[in-house]
């Protein structure tokens, strides 16, 4: 049984890869994407290394079992936006998509409990949260 948590260099943000499963069938979970520079400096190189480790051809996608976004602060979100933007561009240009998210989970607990404090903080934000 394989279970490792890898913290990628995200400077002041968070970008974690959870590896689980077995040596013959490893699986990956991405937790947050870090700030903008994290994608090119840490996340993309690590995902490319995983593609090589799994011996994927250029036409095969690296499967990311679950992508988790804990909250929409830029130091958790921006790297993830770049990941999805790259996949979108590849699809538009009819190129192979290098990484495929099987499922996406966004922490909406505060929305569920109708946390008024969170709503007040969000209304004070200077810019809207980017959409994925």
Regions found by a protein language model. Name each.
Residues 1-3, 59, 81-132:
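Flexible, acidic/histidine-containing loops and adjacent segments that form or flank the divalent-metal
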Residues 1-63:
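Conserved beta-strand hairpin/beta-sheet module of binuclear metal-dependent hydrolase folds
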Residues 26, 41-104:
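Active-site metal-binding motif and surrounding structural segment of the metallo-beta-lactamase
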Residues 35-38, 72-76, 110-112:
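Solvent-exposed loop/turn segments at secondary-structure junctions
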């Amino acid at each position: 049984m394989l279970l490792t948590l890898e913290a990628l260099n995200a400077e002041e943000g968070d970008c974690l890869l959870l590896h689980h499963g077995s040596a013959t069938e490893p699986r990956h979970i991405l937790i947050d994407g870090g700030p903008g520079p994290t994608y090119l400096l840490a996340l993309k190189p690590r995902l490319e290394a995983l593609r090589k480790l799994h011996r994927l051809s250029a036409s095969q996608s690296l499967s990311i079992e679950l992508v988790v976004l804990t909250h929409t602060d830029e130091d958790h979100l921006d790297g993830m936006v770049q990941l999805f933007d790259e996949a979108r561009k590849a699809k538009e240009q009819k190129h192979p998509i290098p990484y495929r998210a099987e499922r996406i989970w966004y922490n909406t607990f505060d929305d569920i409990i109708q946390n008024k404090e969170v709503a007040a903080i969000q209304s004070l934000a200077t810019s809207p949260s980017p959409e994925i």
